[in-house]
């Protein structure tokens, strides 16, 4: 009887494939159900959107048709349609959809933050004058320096005379127009 070499199993043809990258990731049934339920809630959020908001979310034709149908259906049929939408979402990459939905939800918050920044900039313009004008011109090169100076001068006079802050409101409006034109 001949003795087999010690590495005889390593020489099996077709066994050169490395199995290190082919790890099996075990996912519990409960986690799968939680993910499915979360996608169903995402689908329900999308169904509750209006037509204009729905246009801003990247959806393929089948999913869009299912969502539009769910918007027309009431009661038990709607629940089944939402389950179908959840199933369709499981078969797709939902990250772009989530990002678009978050962008729609956070639009108001972003606008409030922008208004606070513009109000602070307006107050600095009134308090600091030319130094703050340079900052505005760095942010928006097409801003009119002369118009800003005039508005700032008028705002300072109104503040000293305890008059209503008409020019301060005009400065804010001008800064808001500059910010909107930038977008």
Curated annotation (Swiss-Prot):
One of its GO terms (biological process) is assembly of large subunit precursor of preribosome. Pfam families: DarP. One of its GO terms (cellular component) is cytosol. It is found in: Cytoplasm. Member of a network of 50S ribosomal subunit biogenesis factors which assembles along the 30S-50S interface, preventing incorrect 23S rRNA structures from forming. Promotes peptidyl transferase center (PTC) maturation. Belongs to the DarP family. This is Dual-action ribosomal maturation protein DarP. The lineage of its organism: Bacteria, Pseudomonadati, Pseudomonadota, Gammaproteobacteria, Enterobacterales. The gene is darP.
């Amino acid at each position: 009887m001949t003795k087999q070499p010690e590495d005889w199993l390593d020489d099996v043809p077709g066994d050169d494939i490395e199995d290190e990258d082919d790890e099996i990731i075990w996912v519990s049934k409960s986690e799968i159900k939680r993910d499915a339920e979360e996608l169903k809630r995402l689908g329900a959020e999308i169904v509750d959107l209006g037509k204009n908001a729905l246009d801003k979310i990247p959806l393929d034709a089948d999913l869009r048709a299912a969502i539009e149908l769910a918007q027309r259906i009431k009661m038990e049929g709607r629940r089944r349609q939402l389950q179908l939408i959840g199933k369709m979402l499981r078969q797709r990459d939902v990250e772009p959809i989530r990002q678009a939905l978050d962008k729609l939800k956070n639009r108001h918050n972003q606008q409030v933050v922008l208004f606070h920044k513009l109000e602070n900039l307006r107050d600095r313009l009134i308090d600091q004058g030319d130094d703050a004008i340079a900052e505005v011109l760095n942010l928006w090169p097409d801003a009119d320096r002369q118009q800003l100076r005039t508005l700032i001068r008028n705002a300072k006079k109104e503040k000293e005379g305890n008059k209503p802050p008409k020019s301060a409101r005009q400065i804010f409006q001008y800064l808001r127009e500059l910010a909107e034109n930038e977008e």
